[in-house]
Amino acid sequence: MTPLIADEVHVESPEAAVAPPSVRLDPDLLSDIKRFGAADVSACFSCGNCTAICPLSDGDGTFPRRMIRYAQLGMKDALISSKELWSCYHCGTCSDSCPTQADPAGFMAAARRYAIASYDRTRLARTLSTRAVLGTIIALALAAFFALFMYASHGVERASRLALFDFIPERLIHLTGVVVMSLVALAALVGVASMVAGIARREGVRFRDVLGGPGAWGRSLRALWLALGIEALGQRRYRNDCGEAAEAEPLYRRRWLIHALTLWGFLGLFLATILDYGLALIGVKATGTPVPIWYPVRLLGTVAGAAMVYGATLLIWNRLRRANVTASQSQFSDWLLLALVWVTGVTGFAIEVALYLPHPPTWGYWVFLVHVAVAIELVLLLPFTKLAHAIYRPVALFFHALAGTRTAESN
């Protein structure tokens, strides 16, 4: 058995494995994280088995062992400022091999929910993660509010063609979207600023290390490419290192692919929406006008929507049948995100079908109303649900890649 190692708390010897005097401790940290779905990791005696078996753990990322020690010691700032917290893809290998069944994988997932709530100043993320009943009420109330808000300004339902933006004015949707996106951007910026400040302080990264000259620019651009292009979008380590246990699964059911299709689909739909509005602004086509399926923006939206619905459907199915560690540990916030993503995608396809039918169905107007309300809610809740991973994980991966780049240059 390995003793409590020094690098867990950055001290010199196992006997000194306590937090430095200058570190502020939170004695309620571990019990608070349990409210976000963590198991009782007090059973963990730091044997190091989880770190040894984790395919992603390396000299600069001794997780989940280090994260668990932070929680046990009450080192909140160290925990939520750890880039390693976001490097984990929750494959469950560590929990399968834990000799005390402390469930380190479940702890890491709960710690990420806790970190999202800690970055959020509104406490909405905490409510959605820890209070299922109230969270359900909030989600339903938001959807109802946006639906009623849109319906209050609805126009005529035309029988000759499906004129969606005569039913709900396009300008109203656009202005509502701008307001919602502004609020989301503000919440995301506050959260990311808090995260970046904490990680930079822990990693000893200063402004000049990132943007202080040609050498720093080169390192930062390389780290950005590794974080966004290779890991966040390409999911290289998730696909190559974390997928070994799932090799028996056919490709279309592998977790990395399901996760990637859901992410790529969401981003593709977001891009298609922006392009559609952009083309409308420059007079190329009116928003919502039926066009051939091979029209570039329409094709992008169709392919992206199919990918998102496919990924979300399999994620829901895996959770219903508790197919893996991640599925068996789903919390309300996970279900809420999947429900919003799935409804947005399915209603979007229903609208597309209705637009191309020879005789426009009146149900298309009501599906459109639901689609708009849920889509706006999905975007509004982005910084407060598991979808916030799309914001915070790339930031953590950037610092992880930057540390690797700096280490390589120093050797």
Task: State each model region's role.
Residues M1-L85, P394-F398, G404, E409:
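Ferredoxin-type iron-sulfur electron-transfer modules and their immediate structural context
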Residues D26, P64, P104-M108, L226, ...:
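Alpha-helix initiation and N-capping motif
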Residues K34, G61, L79, H90, ...:
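Short hydrophobic/aromatic segments of transmembrane alpha-helices and their interfaces
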Residues V41, D58, I68-G278, I282:
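Iron-sulfur-cluster electron-transfer modules
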Residues S46, Q72, H90, V309, ...:
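Short glycine/serine/threonine-biased micro-segments
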Residues R123-T130, D166-L172, F207-G218, A246-I258, ...:
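Membrane-interface segments at loop-to-transmembrane junctions
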Residues T136-Y151, V178-M195, I258-L281, W294-R321, ...:
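Hydrophobic cores of alpha-helical transmembrane segments in multi-pass integral membrane proteins
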Residues R202, N318-V325:
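Juxtamembrane helix-loop transition segments at the membrane interface in multi-pass membrane proteins
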